[in-house]
Curated annotation (Swiss-Prot):
It comes from Vibrio cholerae serotype O1 (strain ATCC 39315 / El Tor Inaba N16961). HAMAP family: tRNA_carboxymethyltr_CmoB. Homotetramer. Transmembrane segments: none annotated. It catalyses: carboxy-S-adenosyl-L-methionine + 5-hydroxyuridine(34) in tRNA = 5-carboxymethoxyuridine(34) in tRNA + S-adenosyl-L-homocysteine + H(+). Its EC number is 2.5.1.-. Catalyzes carboxymethyl transfer from carboxy-S-adenosyl-L-methionine (Cx-SAM) to 5-hydroxyuridine (ho5U) to form 5-carboxymethoxyuridine (cmo5U) at position 34 in tRNAs. The gene is cmoB. GO terms for molecular function: methyltransferase activity; transferase activity, transferring alkyl or aryl (other than methyl) groups. Belongs to the class I-like SAM-binding methyltransferase superfamily. CmoB family. This is tRNA U34 carboxymethyltransferase. Gene3D superfamilies: Vaccinia Virus protein VP39.
Length: 323
């Protein structure tokens, strides 16, 4: 069983978040009561990871921690074996006590692309929607965020996050909650909201943009990252079935069309700050994620297309303000 008491304590310290306490405890109680497949096994393995206070932590340039005296080889091997029971590791990388968790995604590359364009996170209250295992939340903390909350319904991501948290000294300035944004009240409370890799999974993308706006304070900033296609402000791809072997995908606008969507839902100062074709080096199979990955999803004869014949993955980052 997870103990979310620390989450409630952190929320209570922010008056603008206290409305959340009207619904969150019951939601998490209901979540705990459900059967979650491998969760019991993962929880048993999570308990094998000791909580320690690393002598060196770097969240500014990476997500890394170590002591001046390295772990004994046997202890390091035991820890690595436990961490590998939480396979697949999709978002990272992590460098923890001599163990390099080489994840499917080089999430640090995305962070490097967006960081020069966003408002400084120092002392900000931040929400990361669809946060995965929390890699970017640690990087937000490294930029000085006061408190970071992430939401993602995946049990495995929660386990991976809690494993990393233990190895980073049990830092309580960042929390991952197993929720979707549709379960959140309209808090109008966060200085910065991130939504990265979520929009194309939404049947109603404009509703998702409105949900994001309803979490921001007036003047707050949205960082939106999603799959896009080339084209003008009228261009939108709706895959017939799968896209790069993904089933649950719906709308792929051009970056210009997405800018129009943001303006239509009431955002201002909308900027397209980056467009990038995902390289085979940024998303690939590794020792820590042994399933198929991007190289298996693009046409081997023409890597500019997916195996279904659609344009290969292109991702855009847009930044917008809530008036």
């Amino acid at each position: 069983m997870f103990n979310f008491a620390n989450v409630y304590q952190q929320i209570a310290q922010h008056p603008q978040l206290q409305l959340w306490l009207n619904t969150l405890p019951q939601q998490l109680t209901d979540w705990q009561a459900k059967q979650h497949g491998d969760l019991d096994r993962w929880m048993r393995n999570l308990k094998k990871i000791p909580v320690g206070q690393p002598e060196v932590i770097d969240l500014k340039n990476a997500v890394a921690a170590h002591n001046h005296q390295p772990l004994a080889q046997g202890e390091q091997k035991k820890l690595e074996a436990v961490l590998k029971t939480f396979h697949p590791w999709r978002k990272g990388p992590y460098h923890l006590h001599g163990i390099h968790i080489d994840t499917e995604w080089r999430s640090d590359w995305k962070w490097d692309r967006l960081l020069p364009h966003i408002s400084p996170l120092k002392n900000r209250l931040v929400l990361d929607v669809g946060c995965g295992n929390g890699y970017h939340m640690w990087r937000m903390l490294g930029e000085g965020a006061q408190q970071v909350f992430g939401i993602d319904p995946s049990e495995l991501f929660l386990i991976q996050f809690e494993a990393v948290r233990k190895l980073l000294g049990d830092d309580q300035r960042v929390h991952l909650l197993p929720l979707g944004i549709e379960q959140m009240p309209e808090l109008n409370a966060f200085d910065t909201v991130f939504s990265m890799g979520v929009l194309y999974h939404r049947r109603s993308p404009l509703d998702h943009l409105l949900q994001l706006k309803n979490q921001l304070v007036a003047g707050g900033e949205l960082i939106l990252e999603t799959l896009v296609v080339e084209g003008d402000e009228h261009t939108v791809l709706v895959p017939f079935d799968r896209y790069a072997q993904m089933r649950n995908v719906y709308f792929f606008p051009s970056a210009l069309a997405l800018k129009v969507w943001l303006e239509k839902t009431g955002f201002v100062d909308v900027r397209i700050v980056d467009e990038n074709i995902t390289s085979l080096g940024e998303q690939r199979t590794t020792e820590w994620m042994t399933h198929n990955s991007l190289p298996d999803y693009v046409d081997p004869q023409d890597p500019s297309k997916t195996i279904e014949g659609y344009p290969a993955p292109r991702r855009a980052i847009l930044i917008a303000k809530k008036p």
